[in-house]
Amino acid sequence: MQRTVRIIGAPTDYGTNRRGVDMGPSAIRYAGLGDRLDESGRQTTDVGDLFVARTAGQSQRATDSNARHLEETREVCERIEAEVKDTVESGEIPLLLGGDHSVAIGTVNGATRESPMGAVWFDAHGDFNTPSTSPSGNVHGMPLAGLLGYGEFGEMDWARADGLREENVAIVGVRTLDEHERKLLRESDISVFTMSEIDTRGLTDVVADALATATDGVDGFHVSLDMDWLDPQIAPGVGTPVRGGATYREAHAAMEQVAERDDASLRSIEVVEVNPILDEANETAELATELVTSALGKRIY
């Protein structure tokens, strides 16, 4: 029996210096997410948006640790963690709508409270900077490093997810890395699948390996879908677009592979970085909605 999906909005842009992603949850809902999931046979409940305080001039203010709005990010992620934890304990699948990618810290921490798990990270970026290595100070470039306790995050209990096993993490579709990120990732036990590897081997084989990595020896996995994983020609409404991303059909094929896994093994899922200000006729939010419904089991036949 398929589990109910609990939709949770996290309208935050603390993790980026570009405004607009805080409107992502509204844009995705406007694209008909709830109705499409219902039509696919999934029961849903939408708890609305979690409270996110607004800060005047937030795009200019940074903390001494070179991680902008880290305290505000912590507060939001702790709210997300509590809601996701309750969702998992209720036997439902938490579907987190971002917001910038820093929200993943809350989602994964909430989902790992039950037992250890893996993660498949669909992203153009590594998200593996730390406050001391980040060239921008934007926390949306740090969530994976934060969850795995790298650098200063090792002392931040709210960020570090001890139940996320590094050897069970796979990043899919990477095509741009900072120098320090590249070094840290090479030294880690994370499996990194670049777009070049997808070009060479084919997406189906790469995603199969990523899912195998995420589920090896654990009973659950998390899916983090950053919409900049896709090529900006089909997903223009993202904050940090990078050319050469996944095509429309590749993205759906990947999400369909996620859906082929045992329903009980999908611990949580999030879709992030939809920026309606930069979008064209809500195209990116529409695509996000389609991909989420594919990941949760929608079928043509």
Predicted features along the sequence, with ranges:
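Conserved alpha-helical scaffold segments that buttress catalytic/binding sites
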Residues: 2-301
